[in-house]
Amino acid sequence: MAANWTLSWGQGGPCNSPGSDTPRSVASPETQLGNHDRNPETWHMNFRMFSCPEESDPIQALRKLTELCHLWLRPDLHTKEQILDMLVMEQFMISMPQELQVLVKVNGVQSCKDLEDLLRNNRRPKKWSIVNLLGKEYLMLNSDVEMAEAPASVRDDPRDVSSQWASSVNQMHPGTGQARREQQILPRVAALSRRQGEDFLLHKSIDVTGDPNSPRPKQTLEKDLKENREENPGLSSPEPQLPKSPNLVRAKEGKEPQKRASVENVDADTPSACVVEREALTHSGNRGDALNLSSPKRSKPDASSISQEEPQGEATPVGNRESPGQAEINPVHSPGPAGPVSHPDGQEAKALPPFACDVCNKSFKYFSQLSIHRRSHTGDRPFQCDLCRKRFLQPSDLRVHQRVHTGERPYMCDVCQKRFAHESTLQGHKRIHTGERPFKCKYCSKVFSHKGNLNVHQRTHSGEKPYKCPTCQKAFRQLGTFKRHLKTHRETTSQ
């Protein structure tokens, strides 16, 4: 790549199209110095966002676009490999999800090799949050959000939390490297009104450790309120009875009650403490669902503090608690770090009994499996092949059988290119190449590559002979031996 490119695109530059009489735009030394001092990412954004008005000169637009590309890629300073890395990194950032974009930005990756090392070592920030602001999602580090350090009185008011977050965003100085990286992810927020603060949703928090048992981001608010009540006993008074309103009368009659706002629970161990959600849901009196009424300025006690006589995990709506027609709250329990969920009667939840066959007492997890198994006792084979009239217990067996007629063998071995009609046959064939023998006899510790061979072998220990000849009543251990024996009877009959 030519090393003598300048901002003015001198003789022989890429913008000198043949036969063009239009004078070239020559940048002054001051402009060149100012251009070189600017951040390359700024030129990158200017290059990608460049647009040409319809009435402008296309030649001038081409020169301007070429100049912006030169200021971004800087072929006079970078090698071909570095420019290639810049282009690949750009497409990577466009096509990858937001989590990986943050990962690249935070670590300041500049080359594909560094990016590959970063992804292999999985050097990710401890945690970040997805912020839903005015209908759009943005990513911010929790250290910048700074919600975990907010006092309980602030966390009780969602508007104060959102205004504190907005002020922390506005205080980021554009000169610092960290603030500049965050501004690439989150657009500048000039000022959030109080109404916008109420509608601000921090609806999703990502735990980048990948631990499936890690606490989820919707379980801490109620615990914080409970701790605040312990410090301030005045807050633990029960919720006053609300007067009967037309909304409650309409709820009893089965009509649509007034839409209510709720503050959902958040995880007690999640660092980003406050998650505020407004839900506008319609409910009918027949379905029996209702939401907790909660004011953004006041914390509402949980069900256990309202009435200690009520079993844990049960709650009734605020208002007329004895009304039979009024909707009730259906609590949803999720296991957390504290241990299993307690039940009203102090009894542990019992797993549903498995579905057992009434003939052979074999158990199944799903009823559909039991239904298919019962056909082996009744002899029902409802799925029939149109070509050979052979019948099968389930449709998957019929589809596999039809490959015998069509000659289809969709499963191919990667080593010897041999093809098979059944996937299980392919898996057993692959063990020939790998030497794997995963099936072990529980009696003599002998190993086998196929489960069928193990079952036949274990009959030598148990003495089982499931195949019995209907002619001579002789029993056999293996199906192949039994079929060969049946041929002897047919040959004798034919003679």
UniProtKB/Swiss-Prot annotation:
Q: Which domain of life is it from?
A: Eukaryota
Q: Where is there biased composition of kind Basic and acidic residues? A: 250-262
Q: Where is the composition biased (Polar residues)?
A: 17-34, 161-173, 292-310
Per UniProt, the keywords (alphabetical) are: DNA-binding, Metal-binding, Nucleus, Repeat, Transcription, Transcription regulation, Zinc, Zinc-finger
Note the SS bond partners: none
Q: Name one GO cellular component term.
A: nucleus
All residue ranges annotated as the SCAN box domain in the record: 44-126
Q: Which GO terms describe its molecular function?
A: DNA-binding transcription factor activity, RNA polymerase II-specific; RNA polymerase II cis-regulatory region sequence-specific DNA binding; zinc ion binding
Q: Where is this region: Disordered?
A: 1-40, 150-183, 227-347
Instruction: State the protein's name.
Output: Zinc finger and SCAN domain-containing protein 5B
User: Where is the protein found, in the record's own terms?
Assistant: Nucleus
InterPro entries per record: SCAN_dom, SCAN_sf, Zinc_finger, Znf_C2H2_sf, Znf_C2H2_type
Any stretches that span the bilayer, and where are they?
A: none
For this entry, list what GO says about its biological process. Answer: regulation of transcription by RNA polymerase II
Q: Where primarily located?
A: nucleus
From what organism does this protein derive? Homo sapiens (Human)
Q: Where are the zinc fingers (C2H2-type)?
A: 355-377, 383-405, 411-433, 439-461, 467-489
Annotated function: May be involved in transcriptional regulation.
